[in-house]
């Protein structure tokens, strides 16, 4: 009995100790006020983030937040300058020596502690709470109404530590003439000043960047837009949101030459023949913004997107740039920091400037080298070992929207997420880790591509671990709900796959900025009647599924569904119908009325887009950017040449279907979504049976990317152990082959090989350089 009493007593004591030692959960209840402790000395970006969190708490929990300097349910602070964090009782050592990092942790007494390694980290930590509440970064920009909650709870064991993979992460608003500029200037922030995009608009953009954990902004710079720094209130808005201001390849020293030279410059924008005036133009701007967080672009091109004036040869241009570097860095040393190596600077070898760089241009060691894609998603240069070792590091400027040759893609933002992932992962692995900037056009409708890009820049390992499909799935679930996402995920995958084969903007088989006007005439694509009908049927299925799935979307997310899914998918469907039915009609195989009806559908869809949310997005969506011929109603005429004949392959494989070899399948990439990377020195083997022919034509179809190391991109082909044939397929920018490649998203090489009478044959394709990505292999009998 005595032992039993002792045992019961000890058990009771153990329970008491257990209860007393149990860590409390962090809990917020609907309608209950939330106290947030934060020092008044924190940076503006921290205060801004707290304002956004307060708004989110009100939306989700109907809870009013109060900011206090001493106590609260939530404790916020930056290490090294916040006593609140020092006294919070959590281990913050993991934050030391990190940039823009944050930690979220529930303390023993059930308080949520938000600690940042610097002000940006603290801000991102605050808005991580908004993410945990279920608030999408696209809450305002895509009308993703947050779901109401009765309770918000985090376990007492909750710990979260995050820091960026890439230091500077941001967007470039570009080609804004038909979307963001008129929408801002006439709808969202009406102004009597022509082309003004003011601080109200920019604050919305900066809020989006902050919620996406981005920190860098290249503002709109076309001639139609009043330059950012000439618009009252814009600079202050950037400071409020902790945004680093940068500028594109043709805007050195934070000067928008396209919009400002005619206002503030004198004479020609020519450093050879009018150097003092150009120097003064730059000097005036540096003096104005010396106290702002600026990433200064060095170098010089033309006033807009063209070559520099006054220097004709590459050697002359190189000499001018060497002089420009010295003078520009002298200005930074004079007005910004006497130690110029402490001023963030970037050099962007875009288009013809890359040729100057390759000719031996010496860029100062502390300047970031920013490499570019070819405007169609394929990065032109990856840093060498020497370039990776530079103090300034490496960056990338990447496009999901573009105006230029061979054809614009400004409308529907159909860049393959799988291509973005493959190229940006390769960029990171090759040492491009300092700065990532995405040309996003008008932001809408590139929402998903923007988030994928920013998520990779923030935490590349996480995106890499889950894969593109899972990332898209989670995004759709957050924006539209689990039920809808399950139905729409395969729709969006197929939407991107079909557009990878041919973007909606390229369906007229036209080209822009060519001397011969025949390129602007809508004409047949080199597709057979069977190929056309298969594509039409595929799009019809997508459109029908999207229409039916709308019933699964909550009423308060219907606008989001239209913006993120219905408009892009159905507009792409109708664009394909318009051009492909016209192609069939030219050959008397369809009625012209079907093409005209598709045009009318595009117009109606766009009108509805611009009427959403009581006209909130009026003027944002234009289905005829630049009024290119491909966007018009198709002119009725008869074909003058027969339609492409159907050609059936004896055998066909995608990259993943190799019988032997280490195929690194690129998830969702390519014509069939199963392209495969072949590492240098590795080979893939494809097997086929006996054919009634003595020779075969082998069509090898690859991703039209650029060399990873050096200037070569080669593979070899061998049949049945014969001597391998070496084939190169690298292209020069703006060459005819490059234009064809980016329009069809394939580089094609053909070779005829002899076949013996063996019952089984082995076709071996071996990568001789890094970067070979095999999409498809076609085998045709040669009669």
Model feature map: region roles:
Residues 21-163:
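Contiguous, structured surface segment used for ligand recognition
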Residues 622-783:
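Extracytoplasmic
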Residues 210, 215-218, 225, 233, ...:
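Structured mid-domain segments that build the active-site/substrate or prosthetic-cofactor binding neighborhood
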Residues 138-194, 200-220, 392-395:
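An acidic-aromatic substrate-binding cleft motif
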Residues 1-24:
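Bacterial Sec-dependent N-terminal signal peptides
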Residues 144, 148-150, 472-626, 684:
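C-terminal non-catalytic alpha-helical accessory regions
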Residues 149-154, 222, 229-230, 237-240, ...:
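Gly/Pro-rich turn-and-neighbor structural signature
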Residues 113-116, 177-199, 215-225, 261-277, ...:
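The substrate-binding groove and active-site-proximal loops of carbohydrate-active enzymes
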């Amino acid at each position: 009995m005595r032992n039993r009493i002792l045992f019961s007593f000890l058990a009771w004591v153990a329970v008491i100790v257990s209860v007393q030692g149990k860590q409390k959960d962090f809990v917020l209840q609907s309608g209950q006020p939330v106290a947030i402790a934060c020092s008044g000395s924190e940076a503006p970006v921290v205060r801004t983030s707290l304002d956004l969190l307060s708004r989110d708490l009100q939306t989700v929990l109907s809870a009013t937040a109060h900011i206090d300097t001493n106590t609260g349910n939530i404790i916020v602070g930056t290490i090294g300058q916040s006593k609140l964090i020092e006294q919070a009782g959590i281990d913050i050592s993991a934050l030391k020596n990190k940039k823009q990092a944050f930690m979220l942790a529930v303390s023993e007494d059930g308080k949520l502690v938000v600690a940042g390694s610097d002000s940006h980290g603290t801000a991102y930590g605050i808005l991580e709470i908004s993410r945990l509440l279920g608030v999408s970064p696209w809450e305002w920009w895509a009308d993703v109404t947050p779901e109401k909650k009765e309770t918000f709870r985090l376990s007492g064991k909750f710990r979260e530590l995050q820091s960026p993979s890439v230091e500077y992460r941001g967007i470039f608003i570009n080609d804004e003439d038909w979307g963001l500029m008129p929408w801002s200037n006439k709808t969202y922030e009406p102004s009597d000043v022509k082309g003004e995009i003011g601080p109200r608009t920019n604050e919305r953009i900066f809020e989006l960047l902050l919620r996406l954990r981005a920190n860098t902004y290249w503002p709109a710079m076309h001639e139609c837009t009043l330059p950012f720094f000439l618009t009252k209130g814009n600079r202050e808005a950037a400071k409020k949101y902790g945004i680093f201001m940068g500028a594109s390849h043709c805007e050195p020293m934070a000067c928008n030459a396209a919009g400002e030279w005619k206002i503030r410059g004198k004479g020609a924008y020519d450093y050879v023949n009018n150097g003092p005036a150009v120097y003064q133009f730059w000097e005036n701007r540096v003096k104005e913004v010396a106290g702002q967080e600026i990433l200064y672009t060095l170098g010089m091109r033309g006033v807009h997107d063209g070559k520099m004036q006054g220097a004709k040869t590459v050697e002359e241009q190189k000499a001018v740039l060497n002089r420009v570097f010295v003078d520009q860095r002298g200005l930074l040393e004079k007005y910004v920091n006497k130690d110029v190596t402490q001023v963030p600077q970037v050099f962007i070898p875009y288009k013809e400037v890359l040729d100057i760089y390759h000719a031996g241009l010496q860029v100062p060691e502390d300047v970031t080298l920013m490499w570019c894609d070819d405007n169609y998603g394929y990065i032109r240069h990856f840093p060498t070992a020497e370039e990776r070792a530079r103090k300034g590091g490496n960056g990338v400027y990447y496009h999901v929207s573009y105006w230029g040759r061979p054809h614009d893609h400004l409308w529907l933002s159909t860049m393959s997420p799988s291509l973005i992932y493959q190229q940006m992962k390769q960029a990171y692995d090759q040492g491009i880790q300092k700065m990532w900037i995405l040309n996003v056009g008008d932001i809408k409708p590139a929402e998903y591509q923007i988030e994928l890009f920013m998520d990779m820049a923030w935490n590349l390992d996480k995106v890499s671990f889950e894969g593109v499909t899972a990332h898209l799935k989670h995004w759709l679930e957050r924006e539209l709900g689990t039920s809808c996402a399950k139905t729409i995920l395969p729709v969006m995958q197929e939407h991107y796959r079909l557009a990878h084969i041919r973007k909606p903007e390229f369906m007229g088989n036209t080209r822009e900025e060519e001397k011969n006007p025949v390129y602007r005439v809508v004409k047949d694509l080199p597709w057979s009647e069977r190929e056309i009908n298969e594509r039409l049927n595929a799009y019809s299925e997508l459109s029908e599924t999207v229409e039916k799935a709308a019933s699964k979307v909550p009423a308060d997310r219907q606008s989001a569904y239209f913006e993120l899914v219905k408009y892009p998918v159905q507009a792409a469907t109708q664009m394909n119908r318009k051009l492909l039915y016209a192609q069939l009609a030219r050959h008397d195989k369809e009625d012209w009325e079907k093409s005209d009806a598709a045009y009318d559908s595009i117009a109606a869809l766009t009108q509805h887009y611009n009427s959403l949310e009581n006209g909130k997005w009026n003027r944002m969506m234009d289905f005829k950017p630049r009024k290119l011929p491909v966007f018009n109603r198709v002119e009725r005429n008869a074909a003058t040449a027969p339609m492409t004949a159907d050609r059936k392959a004896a055998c066909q494989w995608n990259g993943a279907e190799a019988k032997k070899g280490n195929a690194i399948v690129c998830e969702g990439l390519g014509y069939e979504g199963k392209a495969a990377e072949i590492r240098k020195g590795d080979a893939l083997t494809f097997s086929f049976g006996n054919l009634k022919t003595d020779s075969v034509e082998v069509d090898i179809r690859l991703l039209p990317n650029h060399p990873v190391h050096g200037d070569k991109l080669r593979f070899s082909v061998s049949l049945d152990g014969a001597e391998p044939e070496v084939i190169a397929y690298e292209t020069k920018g703006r060459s005819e082959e490059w234009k064809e490649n980016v329009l069809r998203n394939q580089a094609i090489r053909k070779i005829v090989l002899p076949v013996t009478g063996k019952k089984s044959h082995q076709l071996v394709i071996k990568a001789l350089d890094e970067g070979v990505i095999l999409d498809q292999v076609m085998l045709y009998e040669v009669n």
